[in-house]
Design a protein with these regions (language model features):
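Generic structural signal for small/hydrophobic residues in well-ordered secondary structure
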Residues: 13-16, 23, 44, 60, ...
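Short acidic, glycine-rich loop/turn motifs
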Residues: 64-66, 104-106, 168-172
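Alpha-helical transmembrane segments
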Residues: 22, 29-58
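Mid-to-C-terminal secondary-structure elements
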Residues: 119-132, 147-226
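Solvent-exposed, non-transmembrane alpha-helical starts
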Residues: 67-78, 109-113, 140-143, 187-201
Length: 226
């Protein structure tokens, strides 16, 4: 019986070739687009899913009277710290970072990279795990740097690089060696390391180095992500 169904279907296809082809192409296109849309929606739903207490994580966004005063995704540098101090029962933790682009070098290899200068709470706040290093002390030293697994391999060709150094240039042109104190497992998709399509930070430095880069965390700085 099933064989007869196939024969009938094939007869109809060959008898009405153009319309059959049109229907098949239309159906195939619809199925493909359905899968593509489903894949896109699923991918978007996975953003931040792996963060600690993801449902209780919030970005501070700003609405400036003067649009040129700052960005919607940034706010005044001390704000989240002040909120934690003034409302300890409401704000359990915070993480602020300033994104910059700088030149990194290792031997004769030179790289232009986005850096994230932030609070030492990065790992405890979001639950990112280190494959090498101590999460409790990774950002204690002023010249400490934490790299993702991807960047460790890019710069050194391996991941077990604790104690190794990489040179980072400031905006004034001075160069300083930073010691690798942690190697981060490549994080699942999130809006902390990849806040925009143009921003994908994989090099993390303690905010103790703000002066080296000519940055600050005072009320005059409206370009801090919190």
């Amino acid at each position: 019986m099933l064989k007869n169904y196939f024969k009938t279907a094939w007869r109809n296809i060959t008898k009405r070739g153009f319309y059959s082809l049109l229907n098949i192409v239309g159906l195939s296109t619809g199925i493909v687009f359905t899968f593509l849309i489903g894949a896109y929606v699923w991918n978007e739903l996975q953003v931040n899913k792996k963060l600690n207490n993801a449902k209780n994580q919030f970005f501070l966004k700003s609405e400036w009277k003067n649009p040129n005063q700052g960005l919607e995704i940034t706010t005044l540098a001390p704000l989240s710290k002040r909120l934690k101090e003034d409302y300890p029962n409401l704000v359990a933790n915070y993480y602020r970072w300033d994104g910059i682009t700088s030149t990194l070098s290792k031997g004769d290899k030179v790289f232009r990279e986005g850096l994230q200068i932030g609070d030492s709470t990065l790992l405890s706040m979001y639950g990112f795990s280190l494959m090498h290093g101590n999460a409790a002390t990774a950002f204690e030293a002023p010249n400490a740097v934490v790299l993702t697994k991807e960047r460790a391999i890019k710069y050194f060709g391996r991941t077990n690089i604790l104690g190794e150094t990489i040179t980072i240039e400031s905006f004034s042109g001075t160069k300083q060696d930073f010691q690798v104190t942690g190697v981060l497992n490549n994080p699942a998709r999130n809006s902390i390391t990849h806040i925009t399509d143009d921003n994908n930070n994989q090099v993390y430095i303690s905010n103790k180095n703000l002066d080296y880069f000519g940055r600050n965390m005072d009320w005059n700085n409206p370009y801090i992500v919190s």
